[in-house]
């Protein structure tokens, strides 16, 4: 079954995440483990490893690292992605999330809904960028890309 069965966030930031960021992380992990699609493509003519997979996400030397292991914890792959293509969309996502969290405290539902729609649009853009960057490295569906994008945001800013 080609899916992620365990995910770990290798977060080395000395600054603890805010309550909102921690909540986003926990929800994304829960949702990701409940339902996801993650497969490794054929490479160099060799059959790809079959899931389920254990995934560790980390940022090392300014690059996003996907460390992929079998359920038995044998390494089956690792790849690194440049953070450059994610920087602006992550920044935009965090700015709109801050606006959303503030709006929930003081604005009427109609204005909160408008901000939430903008937040979802930016989140979808981040998922699209991630799917593009994963091309040839891993195959994911859009919902999996959305949840992984949330975790990348937590890593990037947490």
Swiss-Prot record:
It comes from Cereibacter sphaeroides (strain ATCC 17029 / ATH 2.4.9) (Rhodobacter sphaeroides). Coiled coil: none annotated. Belongs to the UPF0262 family. Pfam families: UPF0262. This is UPF0262 protein Rsph17029_2283. InterPro entries: UCP032146.
